[in-house]
Amino acid sequence: MSVRHPSIIVIAHNIRSTHNVGAIFRTAEGLGVERIICSGYTPYPALSANDPRLPHLAEKLTRQIHKTALGAEELVPFATSTEPPLAALRQDGYVIAGLEQNPRAVPLPHYQAPPKLALLLGEEVAGIAPGLQTACDVLLEIPMAGRKESFNVSVAAGMALYQLLCHN
């Protein structure tokens, strides 16, 4: 990895698939992401204490996430939130970057990551809601050469995190 290593928090908002969540945890652990915030209806691993979900549901989701996370869900600190805590992160000095295709998005290879960055990922089909896009300090996009208009959210997260952490 490069000498410069920004502090990155991933916000996984309204991601439906436990397999995508697990893959994001595994990639985040491998690249040294500080923590993950699972917001909206994003499934998350069992909490160590006071998990508000029914025990059988928490166990089921944790097992499903573990299939792709392979233990990374136990190593990467995470929190849950009904909405992405953008104001609190900004107050802590984080720049909020949404990973989204948008005419105002900066191509990821042209973006210089600040020392503290919160990377917002949106749902698999619709991406980041327009209101949340507006709330971001910057939108980033992964340039595409193919005819499809998007990558899988966990794949996009991996490409973006690698670029931000290793090639910045």
Task: Locate predicted features.
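Structured adenosyl-cofactor binding patch, chiefly the S-adenosyl-L-methionine
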Residues: 130-168
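Short amphipathic alpha-helical segments
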Residues: 23-24, 50, 109-111, 131-134
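A contiguous loop/helix-start segment that scaffolds small-molecule binding in enzyme catalytic cores
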Residues: 116-117
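Short beta->alpha connector loops at strand-helix junctions that form conserved
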Residues: 13, 39-40, 100, 123, ...
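Short acidic active-site motifs
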Residues: 84-85, 107-109, 128
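RNA substrate-binding interface of SAM-dependent RNA methyltransferases
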Residues: 1-101, 165
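Short, glycine/polar-rich helix-capping loops at beta-to-alpha or helix-loop-helix junctions
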Residues: 61-66, 126-132
